[in-house]
Amino acid sequence: MRPIRLAYRDRDRLPVIECIREMARRHYDVDVVVVRIEPTDEYEAALFDDRCDLIVEHLEYLYARAAVHSETEATMFCAPVDRTGVELMALPAVKDASELRGKTVAVRSSGRPDSLYMRLKAAGLDPSDTVLVPDRDVGRWNQWKKVVSGECAAVFMSPLHMASAEAAGLRVLPLPDLPMIGNYGHACLTRFATENDALMEDYVRAVVHAICLIKYRPAEALEVVLAAPTTQEGDDAAELERRIGIIAQTLLTTPFPSGEAIANTHAVAIAEDPASAGVDPRTLWSARWVERLEGSGFIAGLVAELSADG
């Protein structure tokens, strides 16, 4: 099989990664070598230090790098999620997001807080009425504790991690999401893409196959994840099943972002590093493999096959 090295940071990505790996092995003669790279500075250097061929999350830093080096150095090519993917939660006494004006919203300091500031602003709320809460202060994704304590009126939570918040009495408060490059966005070096065009196309086939498996055959996806080498002893099957169900709702079978999602993500990158403003974000994106698969009928055929009743 042809090897390709895929780097990630966050274990929350593993259900999708492991389905990609297994679909690539079963159907497309591709050996996806999964590598976890931490901390963030090492992860950001990995593409350029030849520690991986692809990355599967956290693409924003590539815009600032492109402004300094070259807009053609890296290629972003796949985006299975087109929104921020987190929910606003509050106690039941808060019925509408408009009631949060002048009140404090807790925001996890990790990830992309600027994307959440954009959502608040779009909803007519003041992004300055927020407080960044690092995991080290409350535990991973336990920012909801700031609402229970009365320090904050609401909190942004990942659906993967909101069970404890719901148990504490918090409920989802509707707030429009924004088009955004969400979880599982992919990038590689442009040179690698050019030199390995057929491999890249087959890798994207595996991505689409994994997406369809998760969306339409979740029981089979769960079997893949439970058998995966990265699944740790003691991982709860019911919890993994719940997570696969949540992830399935977010995935696009044609995994390429809209122009608005690209623009909004670029705005986040600029907020994180103003150097990113010197780059046209469209120059870093290539739709060629997704377009080939869509144009050939591959995606529609796979959707029809896997969504059919077994």
Where are these predicted regions, by residue range?
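Short, glycine-/small- and polar/acidic-enriched structural segments
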Residues: 2-132, 153-157, 173, 178-180
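Short glycine-centered helix-capping/turn motifs at secondary-structure transition points
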Residues: 21-24, 50, 150, 169, ...
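Residues within well-ordered alpha helices
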Residues: 22-26, 119, 164, 224, ...
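Short, hydrophobic alpha-helical packing/hinge segments within bilobed ligand-binding/sensory domains
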Residues: 42-46, 140-146, 162, 243
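Cytosol/matrix-facing juxtamembrane amphipathic
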Residues: 135-138
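Pocket-lining segment of extracytoplasmic ligand-binding domains
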Residues: 142-231
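Secondary-structure end/capping motifs
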Residues: 196-277
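Conserved C-terminal helix/tail region of periplasmic/extracytoplasmic solute-binding proteins
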Residues: 270-310
